[in-house]
UniProtKB/Swiss-Prot annotation:
Gene Ontology CC entries for this record: chloroplast; mitochondrion; plastid
Feature: transit peptide: 1-87
Keywords carried by this UniProt record: Acetylation, Chloroplast, Mitochondrion, Plastid, Transit peptide
Family according to the record: Belongs to the bolA/yrbA family.
Lineage: Eukaryota, Viridiplantae, Streptophyta, Embryophyta, Tracheophyta
Annotated localization: Plastid, Chloroplast; Mitochondrion
One of the Pfam families matching this protein, by short name: BolA
UniProt xrefs under PANTHER family: PROTEIN BOLA4, CHLOROPLASTIC_MITOCHONDRIAL, PTHR46230
Subunit organization: Interacts in vitro with GRXS14, GRXS15, GRXS16 and GRXS17, but not with GRXC5. Interacts in vivo only with GRXS14, GRXS15 and GRXS16.
Modified residues (N-acetylserine): S88
Known role: May act either alone or in interaction with glutaredoxin as a redox-regulated transcriptional regulator, or as a factor regulating Fe-S cluster biogenesis.
Name of the protein described by the UniProt record: Protein BOLA4, chloroplastic/mitochondrial
Amino acid sequence: MAQTLMATTRPYVLLSSTRASLYRLFQSSKRPFASFSAPLVRFTNSRCVSAVLSRKETAPSSIYGNRVSRVSGFGALDIRSLNFSTKSSQINDAGSIDQTLMQSMELKIKEQLNAESVTVTDMSGDGRHVCINVVSSAFEGQSAVNRQRMVYKAIWEELQNVVHAVDQMTTKTPSEV
């Protein structure tokens, strides 16, 4: 079982690890295992391993060489060899899909609740956070929680796909307006 780096009260502590991972970390086979004088490794509270240089050295090139490396639990890793990619989402710039989304939400609420007035406002600029104001006679005799449930039920499909959260919701009856 490989031993791991541990945080101690001393700032420059190198606890043992496997010889192969140290070799890969410092990229030098000429230095013996116990004689790392300049660069040391310490373990920080955020579970990141960072290189600590002695006072003589000014650049981390002796640690990483020309390669961009990061230390993982299994030794050093060349991060350029990893394939990073992102997946584009359905949401484009503000105003492209959002207006049709807001209008479809307003239409669904009006149809299902026979609402007199419905306003759906984009709060975040990308359609993920919305503010909803509804005036409907269907809210007569309903508690505030049940009124919100009725609105959520009407726009459930949008809440599952594009809309992340309803930041504010106002539900009133015509007599309360």
